[in-house]
């Protein structure tokens, strides 16, 4: 993306509202032109499209004075399903409560509704913003919808005692290590909290003993030094052993979609084509 052009445009206006995705917020915060924009009038900042990382949210409010209000939606249920109150004064990491006229619930692997607070399950949605179906693809539509008209989002989430939902990860991105579920976003949130890390993506890679292990791709901040050992030490006190990255690869950039979402699929495909499946274990 052409960030200098973005900042030139923003600097010519009084900014009251600003929507974006985590990668955009993060890239802007670390760009030298960020302070050329007058953020003092910013009243509403909405994050969506992907999980907003805690480190990015904290830095954003420190520099602009306006917290990121996170919401949740998807192409099949556009534009929004849940959102935090816009009057909120802090970033919570939750995706909020269902918007008006929308029903949201969690289901287990058998499609049964989960009623216990804090239990993880697939987010299913019913409301006026939910699609009627995929155009001329009845089989795929049938797979995506429940018998009572809920859309199966493929996203894993949880709900707290207040009725606030949290987005954990995509069901298809789940990493299974020795039978234990690992959500990439949890690993990424820990690694990205390191001041030397600009961006990171976690995926599962095949392992003969565990089925899968966690691999993290890391982009360093310009001029900063961070090694594998630094990251292992940081994660050792913050993640259970099976959630810790066992393989770390440093890169200059990470593949992104035109919307700024990281393309895990591309990274997984690159790993599948790698002839060297051996790894060094760290505990």
Predicted regions and their residues:
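Active-site glycine-centered loops adjacent to acidic/histidine catalytic or metal-binding residues
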Residues: 49, 73, 96, 155, ...
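AMP-binding/adenylate-forming catalytic core of the ANL superfamily
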Residues: 10-11, 18, 127, 132-133, ...
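Short hydrophobic/charged patches on amphipathic alpha-helices used for structural packing
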Residues: 3-7, 26, 34, 142, ...
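Beta-strand->loop->alpha-helix junctions that form or flank phosphate-binding loops
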Residues: 69-76, 96-98, 203-206, 249
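Acidic/polar alpha-helix N-cap and adjacent early helical turns
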Residues: 269-283
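Core-facing hydrophobic residues within beta-strands of well-ordered domains
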Residues: 39-42, 99-102, 197, 245
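Conserved ATP/PPi-binding loop(s) of AMP-dependent carboxylate-activating enzymes
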Residues: 97-101, 112-144, 182
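Gly/Ser/Thr-rich phosphate-binding loop
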Residues: 7, 15-20, 29-90, 103, ...
């Amino acid at each position: 993306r052409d960030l200098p052009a973005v900042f030139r445009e923003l600097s010519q206006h009084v900014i009251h509202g600003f929507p974006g995705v985590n990668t955009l917020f993060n890239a802007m915060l670390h760009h030298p032109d960020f302070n050329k924009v007058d953020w003092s009038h910013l009243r509403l900042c909405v994050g969506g499209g992907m999980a907003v990382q805690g480190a990015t949210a904290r830095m954003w409010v420190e520099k602009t004075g306006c917290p990121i209000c996170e919401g949740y939606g998807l192409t099949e249920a556009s534009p929004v399903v849940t959102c935090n109150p816009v009057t909120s004064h802090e970033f919570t990491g939750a995706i909020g409560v269902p918007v008006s006229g929308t029903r949201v619930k969690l289901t287990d692997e058998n499609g049964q509704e989960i009623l216990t607070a804090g239990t993880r399950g697939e987010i299913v949605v019913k409301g006026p913003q939910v699609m009627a179906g995929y155009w001329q693809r009845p089989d795929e539509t049938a797979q995506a919808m429940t018998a009572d008209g809920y859309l199966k989002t493929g996203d894993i989430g949880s709900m707290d005692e207040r009725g606030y939902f949290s987005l954990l990860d995509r069901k298809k991105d789940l990493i299974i290590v020795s039978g234990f579920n690992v959500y990439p976003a949890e690993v990424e949130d820990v690694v990205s909290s390191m001041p030397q890390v600009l961006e990171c993506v976690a995926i599962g890679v095949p392992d003969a003993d565990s089925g899968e292990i966690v691999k993290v791709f890391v982009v360093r901040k310009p001029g900063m030094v961070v090694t594998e050992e630094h990251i292992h030490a940081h994660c050792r006190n913050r993640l259970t052993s099976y959630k810790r990255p066992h393989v770390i690869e440093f890169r200059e950039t990470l593949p992104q979609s035109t919307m700024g979402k990281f393309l895990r699929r591309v990274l997984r495909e690159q790993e599948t084509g790698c002839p060297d499946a051996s790894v060094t274990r760290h505990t």
